[in-house]
């Protein structure tokens, strides 16, 4: 059975968790492949909201095994807190969760250094990090100095950890004038973490390959989106990993032959958190109106998201990079009650129309817009395409034509049931 991938096409917060939740009922295994606790996935089931940061949202389904892949950076105590919270809400997390032995561990010194670096930068050089230590942990991974989950299975890790803590404390003191972190506190935390998850630690790449060959249905989920990819996003205003298709394969160990479906998730408008260029951004009252209508505040930090119109060039870029085979369009209901809805269909730079989404100079482009007549009726909760207002259907059809990929799922509200899918079109 081939694997499927859900990937964000914008700057994250596209509604991946809802789509993953919708697809989970037909899935045996869900795998998180990159990122860390800097991401928040929100799922609403029967009016109750659940927020996930590290644990795959498929944990709420009885039949689904959840896997944390090798591409994730894991804050061990935050992870246990999240698992315990979900256990109290009735989900047997520890009975259905597998953890890659190659997953890198994130420690307090990572977040402290991250926060210190961001604080010392001038406003024009700030990245807009969540200060969770994600990038610093990935840097240690690339420097080959980090500790992995599997290292904890041998007590010799303590020698390496002591050396790392001493090194990071020197950095905290000499560069940032910050107090040291405690080796003993970190080590005791790791012992507690291991006592909870030791039986869950395995070679997940081998496990996934074995299960796929048995015909199991596997769904890959990431954090953030293509616009935040460290290689193909709006660098340097990006995350420190690859949320794109290539990152999914590396972050799970699944070979490309197993991957057949790549589902791109996109909002019917655009948002981003933090710094960086945003060509279609709405400022002032217009931006605030869309933010309030869409409830655009970060699930992890609570930060207000910047809001703007749909960007076709960005979506075409995401389709190319990820090999997207279908699109799920979310939050179309938020656009109700607009007289007109502009869509960015291209860019000009120095008077010349660009062929594609640029790697540099996005902050200097002139946006080419086409306007669509809006619809006034409330479409929240509609589950059949034909019941949508004609102007809404025209908007969706135009996006599909420009993107060049079939839109076969439309979300009309936060709940699982507020979804138009498949035969409804």
Swiss-Prot record:
Question: Could you tell me where this protein is found in the cell?
Answer: Cytoplasm
Q: Which SUPFAM superfamilies match?
A: P-loop containing nucleoside triphosphate hydrolases
Q: Which residues bind IMP?
A: 13-16, 38-41, 130, 144, 224, 239, 303
Which metal ions or organic cofactors does this protein require, according to UniProt? Answer: Mg(2+)
- Binding positions for Mg(2+) per the UniProt entry: 13, 40
Where, in this chain's numbering, is substrate bound? Answer: 299-305
Keywords from UniProt, A to Z, are: Cytoplasm, GTP-binding, Ligase, Magnesium, Metal-binding, Nucleotide-binding, Purine biosynthesis
Tell me, what does this protein do in biology?
Answer: Plays an important role in the de novo pathway of purine nucleotide biosynthesis. Catalyzes the first committed step in the biosynthesis of AMP from IMP.
Q: Which reaction does it catalyse?
A: IMP + L-aspartate + GTP = N(6)-(1,2-dicarboxyethyl)-AMP + GDP + phosphate + 2 H(+)
Which residues take part in binding GTP? Answer: 12-18, 40-42, 305, 331-333, 411-413
PROSITE patterns, per the entry: ADENYLOSUCCIN_SYN_1
Provide the GO MF annotations for this entry: adenylosuccinate synthase activity; GTP binding; magnesium ion binding
Q: Please indicate if the UniProt record lists Cytoplasm as a keyword.
A: yes
- Description of how the protein assembles with itself and partners: Homodimer.
- Biochemical pathway: Purine metabolism; AMP biosynthesis via de novo pathway; AMP from IMP: step 1/2
Primary localisation category: cytoplasm
Relay the cofactor remark from the entry: Binds 1 Mg(2+) ion per subunit.
RNA-binding recorded as keyword: no
Protein name in the entry: Adenylosuccinate synthetase
Family as reported in the entry's similarity comment: Belongs to the adenylosuccinate synthetase family.
């Amino acid at each position: 059975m081939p694997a499927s991938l859900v990937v964000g096409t914008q700057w994250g917060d596209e509604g991946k968790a809802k789509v993953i939740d919708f697809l989970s009922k037909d899935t045996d295994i869900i795998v998180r492949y990159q990122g860390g606790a800097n991401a928040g996935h929100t799922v609403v089931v029967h009016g109750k909201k659940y927020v996930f940061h590290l644990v795959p949202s498929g944990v709420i389904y009885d039949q689904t095994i959840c896997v944390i892949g090798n591409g994730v950076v894991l804050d061990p105590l935050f992870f246990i807190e999240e698992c315990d919270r979900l256990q109290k809400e009735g989900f047997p997390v520890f009975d259905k969760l597998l953890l890659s032995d190659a997953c890198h561990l994130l420690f307090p010194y990572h977040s402290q250094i991250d926060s210190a670096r961001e604080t010392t930068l001038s406003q024009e050089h700030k990245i807009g990090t969540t200060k969770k230590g994600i990038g610093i942990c990935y840097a240690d991974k690339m420097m080959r100095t980090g500790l992995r989950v599997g290292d904890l299975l041998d007590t010799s890790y303590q020698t390496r950890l002591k050396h790392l803590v001493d090194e990071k404390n020197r950095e905290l003191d000499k560069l940032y004038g910050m107090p040291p972190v405690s080796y003993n506190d970190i080590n005791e935390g790791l012992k507690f973490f291991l006592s909870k998850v030791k039986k869950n630690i395995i070679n997940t790449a081998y496990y996934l390959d074995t299960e796929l060959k048995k015909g199991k249905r596997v769904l890959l989920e990431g954090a953030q989106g293509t616009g935040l990819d460290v290689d193909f996003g709006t660098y340097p205003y990006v995350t420190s990993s690859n949320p794109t298709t290539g990152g999914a394969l590396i972050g799970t160990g699944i070979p490309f032959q197993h991957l057949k479906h790549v589902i791109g998730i996109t909002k019917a408008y655009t948002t981003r958190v933090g710094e960086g260029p945003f060509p279609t951004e709405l400022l002032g009252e217009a931006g605030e109106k869309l933010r309030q209508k869409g409830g655009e505040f970060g699930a992890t930090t609570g930060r207000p998201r910047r809001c703007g119109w749909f960007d076709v060039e960005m979506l075409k870029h995401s389709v190319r990079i990820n090999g997207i085979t279908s699109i799920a369009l979310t939050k179309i209901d938020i656009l109700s009650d607009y007289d007109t809805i502009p869509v960015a269909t291209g860019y000009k730079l120095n008077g010349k129309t660009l062929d594609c989404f640029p790697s540099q100079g996005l902050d200097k482009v002139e946006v080419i817009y086409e306007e669509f007549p809006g619809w006034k009726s409330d479409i929240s909760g509609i589950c059949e395409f034909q019941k949508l207002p004609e102007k809404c259907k025209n908007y969706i059809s135009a996006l599909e034509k420009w993107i060049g990929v079939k839109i076969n799922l439309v979300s009309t509200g936060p709940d699982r049931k507020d979804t138009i899918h498949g035969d409804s079109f």
